[in-house]
């Protein structure tokens, strides 16, 4: 479960550092987070690089193998939107994803490869599409 949440945080929220992952609402313990990051790097889902501005920090990014998880996360979000009235995904976003899923997957993939995310930042997917997100 934790590994999927780390991948989700990269794709949906643009998190990249140990500290950012640690701040997630789910409250992962530091030792579990460290272990999962090592596993994700070892299995080729993430790559670890020095932080561009602070060489004492490391940033994590999805590899091609990791980017291939985007469709799975979109399907989980779609399922959640259908079955959980408390879901955080805007309905207009879900509708746009379902309208042309392959196009949206490509757009998300390109955005994440550039260091962006679906929901956070001025260059996020929802910002470029004009979708409101809380």
Residue positions per predicted region:
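N-terminal helix-turn-helix DNA-binding core of bacterial DNA-binding proteins
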Residues: 1-29
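Basic, amphipathic "hinge/linker" alpha-helix immediately C-terminal to the N-terminal HTH DNA-binding motif
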Residues: 52-75
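Active-site micro-motifs of SAM-dependent methyltransferase domains
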Residues: 12, 39, 68
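Residues within the helices of the helix-turn-helix
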Residues: 19, 38, 58
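Canonical helix-turn-helix DNA-binding module
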Residues: 24-51, 55
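A general secondary-structure boundary signal
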Residues: 1-9, 41, 58-60, 73
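Residues at helix-coil transition
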Residues: 12, 42, 78-81
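C-terminal regulatory/oligomerization modules of transcriptional regulators
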Residues: 71-134
